[in-house]
């Protein structure tokens, strides 16, 4: 099972090693504007899932929101510790 920290490390590794065919690398290459739109999209899907879907579907949408948020973190050079100090 992945954790917030292990997912971040995986995404950071992909950004650094740039494996061919990586969706994360492709998203990073599209820039912050694209990534921001994905975060907004996923946040909306979390809201809809919270209103109308099962807990399992909601958990899936929340995981996608966390993924895209972490891709933005990688793009901007933020580390989990930068987030933790604001919780």
From Swiss-Prot:
The species this protein was found in = Corynebacterium glutamicum (strain ATCC 13032 / DSM 20300 / JCM 1318 / BCRC 11384 / CCUG 27702 / LMG 3730 / NBRC 12168 / NCIMB 10025 / NRRL B-2784 / 534)
Q: Please name the InterPro entries in this protein's record.
A: HisE, PRib-ATP_PPHydrolase-like
A GO molecular function held by the record: ATP binding
Task: Name its cellular compartments.
Answer: Cytoplasm
Main subcellular location of this protein, as a coarse class? cytoplasm
Its top-level enzyme class, in one word, is hydrolase
Give the matching CDD domains: NTP-PPase_HisE
- What keywords would UniProt list here? Amino-acid biosynthesis, ATP-binding, Cytoplasm, Histidine biosynthesis, Hydrolase, Nucleotide-binding
**The protein's annotated pathway:** Amino-acid biosynthesis; L-histidine biosynthesis; L-histidine from 5-phospho-alpha-D-ribose 1-diphosphate: step 2/9
What name is this protein filed under? Answer: Phosphoribosyl-ATP pyrophosphatase
Asked if Iron is a keyword of the record, the answer is: no
- Reaction(s) catalysed (UniProt annotation): 1-(5-phospho-beta-D-ribosyl)-ATP + H2O = 1-(5-phospho-beta-D-ribosyl)-5'-AMP + diphosphate + H(+)
Which terms under GO biological process does the entry name?
L-histidine biosynthetic process
The text of the family note is: Belongs to the PRA-PH family.
**Cellular component terms (Gene Ontology):** cytoplasm
Q: What is its EC number?
A: 3.6.1.31
């Amino acid at each position: 099972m992945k954790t917030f920290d292990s997912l971040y490390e995986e995404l950071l590794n992909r950004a650094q090693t740039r494996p061919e065919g990586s969706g994360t690398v492709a998203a990073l290459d599209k820039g912050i504007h694209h990534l921001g739109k994905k975060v907004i999209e996923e946040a909306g899907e979390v809201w809809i899932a919270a209103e109308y879907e099962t807990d399992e579907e909601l958990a899936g949408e929340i995981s996608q929101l966390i993924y895209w948020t972490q891709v933005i973190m990688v793009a901007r050079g933020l580390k989990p510790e930068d987030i933790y100090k604001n919780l």
